[in-house]
Amino acid sequence: MPTLLHLDASPRRRSISRDIGAAFADSWRATAPNGHYIHRDLAADPVPFIDAAWTEICDAVLAAGGTDLAALPTLVRTPAQAAAWRIVEPLLDELLAADVVLIGTPMYNYSIPAALKAWLDQVTFPRMSLAPRRFVVAAARGGSYSPGTPKAAFDHQERYLRDFFAGHFAVTDTVFVTAELANARQDPALAARRAEHDASYADALDTARRLGKEYR
């Protein structure tokens, strides 16, 4: 039975990244009616930031020479570490149970929201490998950051996540489904580019629905 873990990081109840993620999830669930769907709203139910006890667990993993994910609980020694592990364990269980990980996120200040970064920090330990799990990012950004655009070098949303998943999770084929120029909906300075945004948004929704039928 395939499992989809769906994370949302936008604080908006109605947002473009949520819309794109929902298009993928709805298509996935319709195509796999017996699949298991897990949704975690990182904005509505924030994950705590890592603390000193978490770093001690991470140090123990390094000292042990690698990440045997099944053995992680045995590295917990102190009451503070046990409290830290109680935060990590359900998050990591959801991640490891997933065949497909879907992340809906806006671009904030050229990067990702703190809510998503907090989740990444909690579930990431040295030398992990999550391959062959498939990762899909449903992304929105207020401007245009595609290759060849004037602000392409400012994109630390896709670049960061792509590097993170490759470097920490050994997942090198993350797919990004992105709607650009979202600020054209509100910013008079971008009003002339509203049609570009609308086309980008529509294409992202179509792509998300198609991928939702294909990914298992």
UniProtKB/Swiss-Prot annotation:
What is the free-text note on the cofactor?
A: Binds 1 FMN per subunit.
Task: Give the reaction(s) catalysed.
Answer: 2 a quinone + NADH + H(+) = 2 a 1,4-benzosemiquinone + NAD(+); N,N-dimethyl-1,4-phenylenediamine + anthranilate + 2 NAD(+) = 2-(4-dimethylaminophenyl)diazenylbenzoate + 2 NADH + 2 H(+)
Pfam families referenced in this protein's UniProt entry, alphabetically: Flavodoxin_2
Keyword Endoplasmic reticulum carried by entry: no
Entry keyword set: Flavoprotein, FMN, NAD, Oxidoreductase
Binding positions for FMN per the UniProt entry: 10, 15-17
Entry keyword Oxidoreductase: yes
- Which InterPro entries does the annotation name? Flavodoxin_fold, Flavoprotein-like_sf, FMN-dep_NADH:Q_OxRdtase_AzoR1, NADH:quinone_OxRdtase_FMN_depd
Enzyme class (EC, first level): oxidoreductase
Q: Where is the signal peptide?
A: none
Question: Which Enzyme Commission number(s) are on file for it?
Answer: 1.6.5.-, 1.7.1.17
**One Gene Ontology MF term:** oxidoreductase activity, acting on NAD(P)H as acceptor
Q: Subunit composition?
A: Homodimer.
Task: Tell me the protein family, please.
Answer: Belongs to the azoreductase type 1 family.
Reported function: Quinone reductase that provides resistance to thiol-specific stress caused by electrophilic quinones. Also exhibits azoreductase activity. Catalyzes the reductive cleavage of the azo bond in aromatic azo compounds to the corresponding amines.
Name of the protein described by the UniProt record: FMN-dependent NADH:quinone oxidoreductase
